Curated annotation (Swiss-Prot):
Record keywords, A-Z: Oxidoreductase, Pyridoxal phosphate
Catalytic activity: N(6)-[(R)-lipoyl]-L-lysyl-[glycine-cleavage complex H protein] + glycine + H(+) = N(6)-[(R)-S(8)-aminomethyldihydrolipoyl]-L-lysyl-[glycine-cleavage complex H protein] + CO2
E.C. numbers: 1.4.4.2
Name the UniProt record assigns to this protein: Glycine dehydrogenase (decarboxylating)
Designated gene of the protein: gcvP
N6-(pyridoxal phosphate)lysine carried by residues: K712
Taxonomic source organism: Prochlorococcus marinus (strain NATL2A)
Lineage: Bacteria, Bacillati, Cyanobacteriota, Cyanophyceae, Synechococcales
Function noted in UniProt: The glycine cleavage system catalyzes the degradation of glycine. The P protein binds the alpha-amino group of glycine through its pyridoxal phosphate cofactor; CO(2) is released and the remaining methylamine moiety is then transferred to the lipoamide cofactor of the H protein.
Superkingdom in the source lineage: Bacteria
UniProt xrefs under Pfam families: GcvP2_C (PF21478), GDC-P (PF02347)
């Protein structure tokens, strides 16, 4: 066998689905002799980087080499036991959950559950999460997660502003004990909207009618807890909305905040079984009153019924969201933290209410006994009721912190943000991992600093303690069966498997969602995130302990800069929506630095992602729409006209490239020039960057700032709806304005304040993208983009005779995705795009993106990871559906009672004793021949969406209890 005939076993060949032979066949099908000729026909010549010039990315390598390299890097982190607290706590992820959820591609490769009939498993897990949060907080409405606690608090301000009774009120009061990173994000979110933030002391609380809301932190950053009843009542007398940021483990013991009268309760579920991971990702929560259900941000899982009357779950009240309401949306949140919420929900299922209470009581016990030890050693402490933390201000603080570090413990440096050399005090926060031996060790450290003899604590009796100064939980909670019947590992393992078997993920087949880039998430990429050297690190740990993380971050920033043609990158935004927000704020700050803060017009094409206008409004801009022409391109004349009209106030153009219509617009460079001539900046939505990596670089054709979706282009899994990472890359003149942080130094010299709670966002999953880029290398990344474009064009060519491709470039080609026009089917035969989407489930596929960016269409994106047989299987499915439609057209199939209108077909339906449909069971269930070997079954029939919104149920009782009720 010659060298040329040897199989390529590099990672590149593992990641890219089509073989070289497949690639040649696809090129031949399209009429091209080689890939270079094809790509040069797709990419406009003026932006095509034909030689991959200037991209300084290492050559690709195999998985073992990359794992060895990143393992060496991980060892550069110093793994100390963190007692820092401040919203980040050590916890134990039960192995049954780690093995069966976190490490299970059935869970982490799924997409947001828009196609509910094939998403019932994670919808139930999220329904359990919402039930948990509602039970914790005492509020009836909870969402299915937000990005972090700071973002959730900021969203609470937005809701409070929206529903305020005094529309002239513009002040928001914040507890002075708020977590500093939360305050940082609140400042970022409030300033563009003209909201005045003022701090308050709960011992000296004053409020007036110019205040539309207040935020209380319980416990405070020092661990203190207190009864908020009077302040809540005083706030309500002035019609102010009350938000409480609560520690969920403390809330296990304390009377639910909703019973105190809180209107909104937010927090982070990180303590419920999710590693610290250098700041994230973690699932935040947001609960509120029934009256605000249509203003709540993020996604809500609600109960409905399918066409057969069976209970089913779905995403409810979607008309609130950015993909529908655009600049009028309640929030710009798109990606949230579904996988992390699922982990936390199973953590609660695993422990049950008794187990959670035991963990919380242990924290209180250890904190109380540690306080006694401090007093016995004559450390000066302020006596107050606290949940998990003790702050000590003393002259020996630096010595205590240093000695603790030498013994493997990180304490909180006071004041927060100081170096230990300048410490005025130290703080200790206890958590689920605290044990007797840890208290003994801390006692030895503290006694040594005081020069006192260490007493033998081996016989020390740890006295139980309870919280004081605040009412405790009295009513039973989490009585739903799901939280009380799976404490056995066998039962929990089976329950987890039962749920995930209802879900369609990349394990079952291609997910051809346009604008979503559902590519392979390789196992080797995911392995490092569970290593303790990455997963246990606190985001505010000493700089000297973080060398490994800083190397990962520096590598990624340099690689992403090289790939995009920009000069600076911030990894802080923890979702694409937050990347948009950060990028626009950077532009806004740059204008302000030039004395042009009046520039507030943001031009956005009508085809843009819904997050674009929502983010623009959040950033303080006014949105002006730009038309698109009949070919799907931005109307250049309309762009010029709008730019001239608004020239004095023009701030930015937001554009997606390739366009959301699936084509490389030939005049992108001219569009940038038009905006620059009028003093504006150009923002690129990087959702479609998978068609550009290694082929063209936005920074080289006129873009000023763009965000990148690491959970799309750079292989971080979607997790069923998060986590995501949305870094921004900027041109040289914008580098000084990259986001900073109040505790950890990062960002530019003139940095905007933080957009995420952690300084580097969801840093715990950055090793995934590091591994992807390291293994693919420059050539592999370029090849991936080329194959992604080739696969989309192959699908478009095969399907065009059956479903016209709506937009093509002058060469008849598309970018990495294409839009199939189904509108004639509705006008002629009453076939809805939803009918085709649901019928695809019977064929064994997740539907493409439906009715976006054009109503009545399907947007298809295959990615480079899908093999030619899988592409052909999808084409066969779509052609098979078209043939069924033809049978309806010819009158051979009933226009209502047919496989499309009745889809999807469940196993229960096709095995029922009653079958009165004019088509066979086989036609319903096995439309393709190979499906008899393997079949993925939807677990429910088509869901009644309207019923679910009219009869909103988004928390307890659990699904099992509801089934029990209905069976009576």
């Amino acid at each position: 066998m010659s060298k040329a005939e040897l199989k390529d076993f590099t990672f590149k060949s593992r990641h890219i689905g089509p073989t070289n032979e497949d690639e040649a066949l696809m090129l031949q099908h399209l009429g091209y002799e080689n890939a270079e000729e094809f790509i040069s026909s797709v990419i406009p010549n003026e932006i095509f980087d034909s030689e991959n010039n200037g991209v300084s990315i290492p050559d690709g390598c195999d998985q073992n080499k990359a794992l060895t390299e990143i393992n060496i890097i991980s060892k550069k982190n110093v793994e100390h036991r963190s007692l820092i607290g401040l919203g980040y706590h050590s916890t134990v992820i039960p192995p049954v959950i780690q093995r069966n959820v976190l490490e299970n591609p059935n869970w982490y490769t799924a997409y947001t559950p828009y196609q509910a009939e094939i998403s019932q498993g994670r919808l139930e897990a999220l329904f359990n999460f919402q039930t948990l949060i509602s039970e914790l907080t005492g509020l009836p409405i909870s969402n299915a997660s937000l990005l972090d606690e700071a973002t959730a608090a900021a969203e609470a301000i937005s809701l409070s502003l929206t529903v305020r009774k005094n529309k002239n009120a513009n002040k928001f009061l914040v507890d002075q004990e708020i977590l500093p990173q939360t305050l940082d994000v609140l400042k970022t979110r409030c300033e563009p909207l003209g909201i005045s933030l003022e701090m308050f002391d709960n011992n000296n609380f004053e409020i007036d009618k110019n205040v539309f809301g207040i935020l209380i932190q319980l416990p405070g950053k020092n661990g203190r807890i207190w009864d908020p009843t009077k302040i809540i009542n005083d706030a309500h007398k002035c019609n102010a909305i009350v938000t409480i940021a609560i520690d969920p483990l403390a809330q296990v013991l304390i009377k639910p905040m909703g019973e105190f009268g809180a209107d909104i309760v937010v927090g982070s579920a990180q303590r419920f079984g999710v590693p610290i991971a250098f700041g994230g990702p973690h699932a935040a929560f947001f609960a509120t009153k029934e009256i605000y259900k249509r203003q709540i941000p993020g996604r809500i899982v609600g109960q409905s019924v399918d066409v057969e009357g069976n209970q089913a779950l779905r995403l409810a009240l979607q008309t609130r969201e950015q993909h529908i309401r655009r600049d009028k949306a309640t929030s710009n949140i798109c990606t949230a933290q579904v996988l992390l919420a699922v982990l936390s929900s199973f953590y609660a299922v695993h422990h049950g209410p008794k187990g959670l209470k035991q963990i919380a009581e242990n924290v209180v016990k250890y904190r109380s006994n540690f306080e006694s030890i401090l007093m016995n050693l004559e450390y000066p402490i302020e006596k107050y009721s606290a949940f998990d933390s003790v702050d000590v201000y003393c002259s020996e603080a630096s010595e205590v912190i240093q000695l603790a570090s030498e013994e493997g413990y990180n304490l909180r440096v006071l004041p927060i943000g100081s170096d230990f050399e300048n410490a005025k005090g130290f703080g200790v926060t206890f958590d689920e991992l605290t044990c007797d031996e840890e208290i003994y060790k801390l006692h030895q450290i503290l006694a040594q600093v005081k020069g006192k003899k260490t007493h033998d604590l081996s016989n020390f009796i740890f006295e139980n303690a309870s919280l004081i100064d605040i009412p405790l939980r009295e009513k039973s909670w989490l009585e739903q069966s799901v939280f009380n019947q799976y404490q056995s590992e066998t039962d929990l393992m089976r329950y987890i498997h039962c749920l995930v078997s209802k879900d369609f993920s990349l394990v079952q087949g291609m997910i051809p969602l346009g604008s979503c880039t559902m590519k392979l998430n390789a196992a080797a990429e995911l392995l490092p995130i569970e290593w303790r050297e990455f997963s246990s690190i606190h985001p505010f740990a000493p700089h000297t302990q973080l060398t490994g993380f800083h190397e990962i971050i520096n590598d990624l920033e340099n690689w992403l800069s090289a790939l995009t043609g920009f000069q600076g990158v911030s990894l802080q935004p923890n979702a694409g929506s937050q990347g948009e927000f950060a990028g626009l704020l950077v532009i806004r700050s740059w204008h302000q630095s030039l004395g042009e803060g009046h520039r507030n017009i943001c031009l956005i094409p009508t085809s843009a992602h819904g997050t674009n206008p929502a983010s623009a409004v959040m950033s303080g801009f006014k949105v002006v729409s730009v038309k698109c022409d009949e070919y799907g391109n931005v109307d250049l004349e309309d762009l010029k006209n709008k730019s001239k009209i608004h020239s004095k106030n023009l701030a930015a153009l937001m554009v997606t490239y390739p366009s959301t219509h699936g084509v490389f617009e030939p005049n992108i460079r001219e569009m940038c020039q038009v905006i620059h001539q009028e003093g504006g900046q150009v923002y690129l939505d990087g959702a479609n960057l998978n068609a550009q990596v290694g082929i063209c670089r936005p920074g080289s054709y006129g873009i000023d700032v763009c965000h990148l979706n690491l959970h799309k282009t750079f292989s971080i899994p979607h997790g069923g709806g998060g986590p995501g990472v949305g870094p921004i890359a900027v041109a040289d003149h914008l580098v000084p304005y990259l986001p900073g942080h109040s505790i950890i130094k990062c960002g530019g010299q003139k940095a905007i304040s933080a957009v995420s709670a952690a300084p580097f966002g969801s840093a715990g999953i950055l090793p995934i993208s590091w591994m992807y880029i390291r293994m693919m290398g420059s050539d592999g990344l370029r090849k991936a983009s080329s194959i992604a474009i080739l696969s989309a064009n192959y699908l478009a060519k095969r399907l065009d005779p059956y479903y016209p491709v709506l937009f093509k470039d002058p060469n008849g080609l598309v970018a990495h995705e294409c839009i199939l026009d189904l509108r004639p089917l509705k006008s002629q035969l009453g076939i809805e795009v939803e009918d085709v989407a649901k019928r695809l489930m019977d064929y064994g596929f997740h539907a493409p993106t439906i009715s976006w960016p054009v109503a009545g269409t399907l947007m298809v994106e295959p990615t480079e990871s899908e093999s030619l047989p899988e592409l052909d299987r999808f084409c066969d499915a779509m052609i098979g559906i078209r043939e069924e439609i033809e049978q309806i057209k010819l009158g051979k199939i009933d226009p209502i009672n047919n496989p499309l209108k009745q889809s999807p077909h469940t196993l229960k339906t096709v095995t029922s004793d009653d079958w009165d449909r004019p088509y066979s069971r086989k036609e319903a269930a096995y439309p393709l021949p190979d499906q008899e070997k393997y079949k993925f079954w939807p677990s429910v029939s088509r869901i009644n969406n309207a019923y679910g919104d009219r009869n909103l149920i988004c928390s307890c009782p659990s699904v099992q209890d509801l089934e029990d009720i209905n069976s009576v």
